[in-house]
Amino acid sequence: GDGTRVQILHALEQSEMCVCDLAALLGMTKSAISHQLKALRLANLVTFRREAQIVYYSLADEHVKEIIDMGIEHLYE
């Protein structure tokens, strides 16, 4: 759910990643990660590029990164 999407956004803040990398990092199935990425794409928070058979995801723009940073900062206040 929401917590997973936050984890995905935080991971993508570090670097562009494919579904398999995110699944391994978060200990989830590729199917579950794909489902969450679809929601993030529909919200215009992430973008993707295809390289052969692999799709790489990244944050949509610098504004998304700033929002994530503010949210994480707020959690630790």
List where the protein language model places each region.
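Conserved segment of winged-helix/HTH DNA-binding domains
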Residues: 56-77
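Divalent metal-coordination and catalytic microenvironments
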Residues: 1, 33, 40
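N-terminal helix-turn-helix DNA-binding core of bacterial DNA-binding proteins
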Residues: 2-31, 51, 55-62
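Alpha-helical residues within the helix-turn-helix
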Residues: 24, 35, 41-42
